[in-house]
Amino acid sequence: MPSVEVGGAGGWRPKHLHQQYQPKHHQYHHHYTQQQQQQPPPHPHPPPQPLEIREVWADNVEREFKLIRAAIERFPYVSMDTEFPGVIHHPPPSVHHSTLTPSQRYTLLKSNVDALHLIQVGLAFAASPSSPPALAFQINLREFDPRVHRHAPDSVRLLAASGVDLAAHRARGVSARAFAALLMSSGLVCNPGVAWVTFCSAYDFAYLVKVLMGRKLPRALPEFLRYVRVYFGAAVYDVKHMARVACDSYGEVALLGGLERVAGALRVRRAAGRGHQAASDSVLTWDTFREMARLYFPKEGSLDVCAGVLYGLELPDGGDATTKPAK
């Protein structure tokens, strides 16, 4: 994917999607100095244009993935979100999550993802980094049954209150095996021409890696990150990590928090669906990414420091992920 001039309506574009990624997130203070001109504040946006969310079930999954395969060439920027039944394993009460090292965070993540089932995957597609999403798909999976599978009750109640019909998932949902096969053959994964945008993405990618592998997650964090790189490439942008870079560089503390808070701070409105549904959140993630990139990463190459970094699982250059807690 060629690079383009950045600024104004054009926006940034990943400069070398095919190049070997070298983590550089720890160097961002060298890229954002006190002399750098402050970006304009967020401005109110007009109501977003309505976007249809395409619901994907077992009876139409083949047809919908044909549309996905056809869309990738025109819309190679993909925002992704997942829904799953919460978390059931936590750090000891005396240990705050923020004090865990990346490896300890991954061990906790692995224990949850290995034990639980994916419920929904949302995918939103855009033509360029500055374009609104053109297509959105919500893939509904069938494996999870709250009557027999472990889950966090509060999380499942929240999903139900947000319109997720778990009975319909069990009756009409796509099997994880079928989803994995279609995802592998779709051109979405193992494709260096696709760029991925997420928000606080460690669990999202972990569930997709588990589904694609068809088994439990790798034992160690570096091996897991290698699988993420193989399946999803180097052009992976976690908006929560971007927000932390912007906060550290510009003092924008309003950008710290969950997706709804960050979107609100940027005055980005939800364009489709309801919160806590995967496709709607993937669309909101993309629109939040667009506005954050416009305001805080306007120069060509300025987002390179964020590429390939999953929030909370950051590995410093030459580090071993066992000694440094995440910020």
Identify the role of each PLM range.
Residues 3, 92, 115-121, 126-322, ...:
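Metal-dependent phosphoesterase core characteristic of DEDDh/y 3'-5' exonuclease domains
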Residues 1-115, 126-182, 239:
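N-terminal accessory regions of nucleic-acid-interacting proteins
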